[in-house]
Amino acid sequence: MSCDCHRNNRKRALSTRLPFGVGTHKPKHFRDMLKIAWENKDNLSYAWKILSRGVCDGCALGVAGLHDWTIQGVHLCMTRLNLLRLNTMPAMPADALEDVRELQGKSNRELRSLGRLAYPMRRLKGEAGFHRVSWDEAFQSLAEHFQNTPPQRSAFFVTARGVTNEVYYMAQKAARFMGTNHVDNAARLCHAPSTAAMKRTLGIAATTCSYKDWIGTDLIVFFGSNPANDQPVSTKYLHEAKAAGTKVAMVNPYCEPGMERYWVPSNAGSALFGTAITDHWFPVSQGGDIAFLCGVMKILVAEDWIDRSFLESHTEGFESLERQLSELEWGPLERDAGLDKSSMLAMAELIRDAKNAVLVWSMGITQHGFGTEAVQAILNLGLLRGYLGKGFNGLMPIRGHSSVQGGAEMGAYSTVFPGGVPVNASNARQLSEQYGFQVPDWPGYSAVEMIEAASKGDLDILYSVGGNFLRTLPEPKRVADALCKVKVRVHQDILLTDQAMLEGGEEVWLLPAKTRYEQRDGGVETSTERRVMFSPEIPRQVGEAMSEWEILRELAVRAFPEKADQMGCESGWLMREEIARIVPFYDGIQDLRQTGDAFQYGGPHLCPEGVCPT
């Protein structure tokens, strides 16, 4: 049977009847808001400009200013507020990094509290710390390194949080301008299984529906996903959905507290007594998702609770799936899922009774060695019922960090060009004709492969735009050893990390970047629901920080001045015009000018009426 999250103990049941969740472990929204205001008291005016004019940098849900495209009202969450200080803090003292030994052992939170990186700095092997240099010296020295390094021995990595599409685009273009396809970004690490399975099955690599489809659908199922934590504003959508009669099911080993009951601070009733989110919890064992899904599908097919008309008109391979499911035995399925057949029947009955449904998944599904297969199972479940290409239905991978959807679409992957086009000789020739310079046609390193190459001594330059491999990849000691072997490491960032303090093979550089809000000519990000949104430039100058895309562009043309005219993208406006030409489904990006300007590529629903590119 499915479990009821809301009856775990008497104390919890009592707390739901007490105002503000007294006695419950829950976010203290109003207290924390006051704390955030105090932290930003030295720059409150700028903080307000960010909140009222900028696109949220907290997650991939997509809020422009304080409003969105799903429901009316003011939208603000603690994820966004907790990041506010990163955008308002003053510069780090110029001499703070002269001896980094004094900073060893400090947490990344403590390092961030030192302030913004404000000036280009370099640390040579054997030196105790970093010393300030001019931008001209930094560009000239790094340009010479790239000139003297075979392209196969240099690599670029781009983080996901806070990065705009312009930065993704320029990172991949600069890398390929300098002859390498070794470029990757953090978003691929999170949802590569989703991309692979969706491309293969549907011919697309993004959510098929919109957030509006949550409100009014019969059922939402969350697989390995915790939107209350990852996209807090989405709890407002779930509050509205519950009021409209939507049932919510969660398939996850752990009953996430925020998905059990959430206190939406902007809704009086919810702020007082909370909103019960999950109706049915299916506590699969870790890694048991595929077995559970196969059991559910086995019942659906056996009982003929499927949409045969949809399957016959819009899919192929059903007979093969039917045969495979019929051969599965219940004993192994129950053992692997960690749930008995009655639980799978309970889920199958929920699916049977839901004419419309949205299936949502996140990293609890993708971060397994069999992540692609798990996503495939979710897609198969949705196709069996025809939950595709129409209102109140969809297959939705939840993205975490802001603008991660744009990473692959801008081409900041080692295996795809802009538009998600695979790297091969034919596509490289076409992109070379568009760019006017030769684009490499060989697949590059992923982030993990970059570290492997560094460990073997096969990587001479590693250029990181944000990010911290020590905190995102397994075996941090091994990662640190590999990073220390790279001759030249460049850390383009707004803040200091412990990764940047590792001694380099020869040189380590710190290049101070502007935030997304300070970025010249504004910036664009793409949300989970494929909404391309403009965030205007909110001027502020911290030391000598430069816009991230400008740093990358300047380095590329300094390294290869003989083809500088072919680089283009002299401004953010010109770059967006180029993106519209190179990535046709982003046509319209060139017309975005102010807060609230946006478009949703593909419209509210991809695969309309079940017709997919495949």
List each model region and its residues.
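Metal-dependent catalytic core segments for phosphate chemistry
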Residues: 425
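Surface-exposed loop and adjacent secondary-structure segments within mature catalytic domains
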Residues: 411-415
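Cofactor-pocket helix-loop regions in the catalytic cores of large enzyme subunits
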Residues: 3-27, 115-403, 417, 428-611
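A terminal-accessory region detector
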Residues: 405-407
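Low-complexity, highly charged intrinsically disordered N-terminal segments
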Residues: 83-129, 139, 166
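N-terminal amphipathic, basic-rich helices that act as targeting or association modules
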Residues: 28-32, 44-98, 102, 131-135, ...
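Intrinsically disordered, low-structural-confidence terminal and linker regions
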Residues: 1-55, 59
